[in-house]
């Protein structure tokens, strides 16, 4: 039985912030941000908007496009690093959309989260699950503006949904996932013990989180080496040449990274689908959001070969080859 992508849907907060608005908050400029990252604006959610509610909006769009009812979904997988509930928000999403039957769980793999979630869903489809809702969602990290060591202009909130179903047609031709924990320190958001309580002579910490830390040079070197490598490995395993790929959709971290990867693959940048200019780095939502926009604009056509590739904290990376 094949794995077929039935539909996509997305939801973005209406409120957007352009680069100039950061100039009074931190020492930066529109020119510095746009020339180094490709980002011109990003979308932020007000405190009254939850990740779960935005995810539900996107889910309903995807379900409508697939002509499915929420009760016809058998599994929900939410890829996020910023859940409303640290114990998991997939169950909240299940309740929000009225999907009474599916099991629901979260996956945390940072900017590679959607790739990991999609591969995970594909394995369940091969078993007994009929229709699976795959979600990539991340929010602005509340309270970190002015403290965060990763530049604040990366922070955004975008939700994206994708519905998989069983079919004789197979959308996912191949994949490869990788992790190198030796490089973990290059991109972290670590637990920080605070407010220790003493029980006898032993201190018991109450945890909190530090700011995000990133070694930008090392993450850049990692991405521009490992992403082309894993893409070539996937394509070679399928006997598909680079020239046969119609579109590449990479994690939307930074325009310079995407340009370098295109160069190393010897493909024109015009084959790289990007939306960084309008959304910034949307973490686990970046790949599916770019995919959804390309579908809605009819850029992606039936029968085309598409490569998805994510990379991020862990350090993790991976690629999926699709036939639309």
From Swiss-Prot:
GO terms for molecular function: 3-oxoacyl-[acyl-carrier-protein] synthase activity; beta-ketoacyl-acyl-carrier-protein synthase III activity. GO terms for biological process: fatty acid biosynthetic process. InterPro entries: ACP_syn_III_C, ACP_syn_III_N, FabH, Thiolase-like. Residues 252-256 are annotated as: ACP-binding. It comes from the Eukaryota. Pfam families: ACP_syn_III, ACP_syn_III_C. Keywords: Acyltransferase, Chloroplast, Fatty acid biosynthesis, Fatty acid metabolism, Lipid biosynthesis, Lipid metabolism, Multifunctional enzyme, Plastid, Transferase. It is found in: Plastid, Chloroplast. Its EC number is 2.3.1.180. Pathway: Lipid metabolism; fatty acid biosynthesis. It is an enzyme of class 2 (transferase). HAMAP family: FabH. Homodimer. PANTHER family: 3-OXOACYL-[ACYL-CARRIER-PROTEIN] SYNTHASE, BETA-KETOACYL-[ACYL-CARRIER-PROTEIN] SYNTHASE III, CHLOROPLASTIC. This is Beta-ketoacyl-[acyl-carrier-protein] synthase III. It comes from Pyropia yezoensis (Susabi-nori). The lineage of its organism: Eukaryota, Rhodophyta, Bangiophyceae, Bangiales, Bangiaceae.
């Amino acid at each position: 039985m094949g794995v077929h992508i039935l539909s996509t849907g997305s939801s973005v907060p209406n409120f957007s912030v352009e680069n100039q608005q950061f100039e009074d908050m931190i020492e930066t400029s529109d020119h510095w941000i746009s020339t180094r990252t490709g980002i011109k604006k990003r979308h932020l959610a007000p405190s009254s908007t939850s990740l779960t509610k935005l995810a539900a909006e996107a889910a309903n769009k995807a379900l409508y496009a697939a002509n499915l009812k929420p009760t016809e979904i058998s599994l929900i997988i939410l890829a996020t690093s910023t859940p409303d509930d640290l114990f998991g928000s997939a169950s909240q999403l299940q309740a929000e959309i009225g999907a009474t039957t599916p099991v629901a769980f979260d996956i945390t793999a940072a900017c590679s989260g959607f790739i990991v979630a999609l591969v995970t869903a594909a394995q369940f489809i091969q078993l007994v699950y009929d229709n699976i809702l795959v979600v990539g969602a991340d929010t602005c990290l509340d309270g970190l503006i002015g403290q965060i060591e990763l530049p604040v202009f990366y922070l955004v909130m975008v939700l994206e949904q994708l519905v998989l179903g069983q079919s004789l047609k197979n959308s996912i031709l191949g994949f490869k996932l990788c992790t190198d924990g030796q490089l973990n320190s290059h991109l972290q958001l670590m637990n920080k013990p605070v407010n220790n309580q003493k029980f006898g002579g032993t201190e018991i910490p109450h945890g909190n989180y530090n700011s995000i830390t990133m070694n930008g040079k090392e993450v850049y070197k990692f991405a521009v080496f490992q992403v082309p490598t894993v893409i070539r490995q996937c394509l070679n395993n399928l006997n598909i040449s680079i020239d046969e790929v119609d579109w590449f959709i990479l994690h939307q971290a930074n325009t310079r990274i995407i340009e370098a990867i295109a160069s190393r693959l010897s493909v024109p940048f015009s084959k790289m689908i990007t939306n960084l200019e309008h959304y910034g780095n949307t973490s686990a939502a970046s790949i599916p959001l770019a995919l959804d926009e390309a579908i809605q604009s009819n850029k992606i056509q039936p029968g085309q070969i598409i490569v998805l590739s994510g990379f991020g904290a862990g350090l993790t990376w991976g690629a999926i080859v699709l036939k639309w």
